[in-house]
Each structure stands twice: as C-alpha cells, then as structure tokens.
A protein has these predicted regions:
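Short, conserved active-site loops that position catalytic residues or coordinate cofactors/metal ions
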Residues: 26, 31-40, 66-75
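Active-site acidic/histidine proton-transfer and metal-coordination neighborhood
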Residues: 56-67, 77-177, 187-188, 268, ...
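Histidine-acidic metal/acid-base catalytic patches
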Residues: 1-4, 12-29, 62, 102, ...
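Active-site mouth loops of central-metabolism enzymes
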Residues: 2-14, 76-88
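Glycine-rich, proline-tolerant flexible connector loops at the mouths of alpha/beta enzymes
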Residues: 32-58
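Hydrophobic residues within beta-strands of alpha/beta enzymes
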Residues: 31-33, 69-71, 106, 138, ...
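Active-site-proximal loop/turn and secondary-structure-junction residues that shape catalytic pockets
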Residues: 9-11, 35-37, 74-77, 110-114, ...
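A short acidic, helix-capping loop that chelates divalent metal ions and anchors anionic groups
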Residues: 39-44, 77-82, 146-151, 216-220, ...
Length: 292
C-alpha cells in the first residue's frame, strides 16, 4: 500500500511539475493527478497536444523517482442529461492522459440525477472501452447532493453502502471499481465509512479518498479532525484485506496556511496518514494471527 496525495492545491499554486516534485520531496510514495486542475485552460493538458504534454510529465516524474498511481477526472456539470453526454468526451481525454502518466485508476464521478442504469448508458458504457484500450480502471465515487441550502445535504449516487454495491455489481466489469471517499460519509443523513467498507469488501473496493470533516460540510480536512472513526475505519480496511493505495484528498486543509507554514502542514498531513497506514497493517497482522 502506497501513501499517495493529490496534486490539486500544489498544482494550483505552483504548476504541475513543481507539485510533483514537492510531493516527492515531502516523502509521499506516489501522486494522484487531479485533472480538474491540470486540464483547466492554460494548464498543460488543455492544449491539442495533451498526450505529448502527458508524456513530458511522465518522463519528468520518472526521473524524479515518483509515479502517478491514481487520477481524478475533471468535474463537468452533470446535473442535466445533456451535461452528462457532454462530459463523455472530456472524460475520454482524461482517461488517455491518466494512462500515459501511469495511473492505474481514474476516478470519474457518477451523476446523482439518474440511477445506475442511466449512468451506465449515458456515461460509463462510453468510457469503459477507452479505459480497457488504455489498461486503466474507472472508479465511481460515493456522492452527496446539496438541496435548498449549502448545509442541506443528502446522499447522492453511490451514497449508501447498498447503492454503491449495486453500482459495482450492475456494471460488473473488471475495469470498473469503487473509490470510497472517507469524508463524504461524515456528512448529514449519511452512514459511517466503515459500513461502506464492510459492504464493498475486498473485491469491489479499489481506491480511497482520505480526508475528514466536522459533519457539516465537505471540508477535505486532515485525518483525525472531525467525525470519522479512524480506528474503526482502519480495522475494517484490514479486515477486508484492502489492497489499494492510501490516497489523501485533504487539500483544503492546506488553504488556511501561509506559504511559510506549508512545509509544516504537509509534514503533519504526511505523519497522520503514515500513522493510519501503520494501524491498518497492525490490525491486518492481528486478524491473520487470530485466524491461524
């Protein structure tokens, strides 16, 4: 299991190459390329020669000795049927870029305006052939929906353990997996992350987004802050023998710090994640010993 962190906030402030170097220098094992930043206008992958640019980034990262193991597709507006259809071409491009970078999984959000059948027919059925061609898995993520106010939040697509399991089993493709966002189950009217882990199990759960919140909004905060029961989460990940990576998506935690304190903040983030990974391995060993 590798400790991975997202490029988003570093990319926004310094550019993608510097983001990757910083992630390497701060001691992370690999990086998650956030394409909703890297594909923005003026960014490396917004140009017509995006695959060439991806090859350049891949070579740069390889020379640094750090790999891209995961990516996050852009976030186009999928609140209408036409929006979902328009997102297909954006996501195809994102899949191609991610594969060149070396990612094993790309997270592509389902739309919460339709069910699994609608998401498959409008979105994933068009993307899975591209994923297979490029040998990269697509991961759906557990979503939430804001209703008539910022804090009026309810589960969206894949937003309950049962619905997430249904998505994976309905599409039933070796190139389709689950990315469990640990922060989203802390939000109102949702169920704890450990219930999702138990329901998804080893075969369905392929990736994680590690962050936390106070239970009121999607804050993408550092682990150990907020509502998440990290001890139980680590135990359940060990119990299902989770085989994916440990990917931080706690970028908003860094937003409140001045540049002078960013190294200290990232160091705390890194140490927090390493501690959680150690917990998982400790529980994994204990569980194996109990079954011997």
């Amino acid at each position: 299991m590798k400790l991975v962190t997202a490029t988003q906030e570093f990319d926004r402030k310094y550019g993608l190459k510097t983001a990757i170097k910083l992630i390497k220098d701060y001691g992370f094992d690999a990086y998650d390329c956030n394409l909703y930043e890297a594909m923005k206008k003026g960014k490396p992958f917004a140009s017509d020669d995006y695959l060439k640019r991806a090859e350049e980034i891949r070579e740069y990262a390889d020379n640094l000795g750090i790999s891209c193991v995961q990516a996050h597709a852009p976030l186009p507006n999928v609140k209408t049927i036409e929006g979902i259809k328009a997102a297909v071409e954006v996501h195809k491009k994102a899949i191609e870029i991610s594969a060149v970078l070396g990612a094993e999984i790309i997270i592509i959000h389902p739309s919460s305006i339709t069910d699994v059948k609608g998401n498959y027919e409008l979105l994933y059925s068009h993307l899975l052939p591209v994923a297979k061609k490029n040998n990269i898995k697509i991961a759906a993520e557990n979503m939430f929906v804001r209703l008539d106010g910022a804090l009026n939040i309810v589960p969206g697509a894949c937003g309950t353990p049962e619905d997430f399991v249904h998505y994976i089993d309905y599409i039933s493709d070796p190139y389709f997996t689950a990315c469990l966002d640990i922060g989203h189950p802390c939000l109102p009217h949702t169920r704890p992350a450990q219930e999702f882990i138990r329901a998804l199990g080893n075969k369905r759960l392929g990736a994680l987004h590690i962050h936390s919140n106070s239970g009121h909004d999607d804050q993408h905060a550092i682990p150990f802050y907020g509502k998440a029961d990290w001890d139980e989460i680590c135990y359940e990940l060990a119990k299902i023998d989770y085989q994916g990576n440990f990917t931080l998506e706690a970028y908003k935690f860094l937003l409140s710090f001045p540049d002078e304190l960013i190294p200290y903040a990232v160091n705390l983030l890194h140490k927090s994640a390493r501690l959680l990974m150690e917990k998982i391995e400790k529980y994994r060993t204990e569980i194996k010993n109990e079954t011997c």
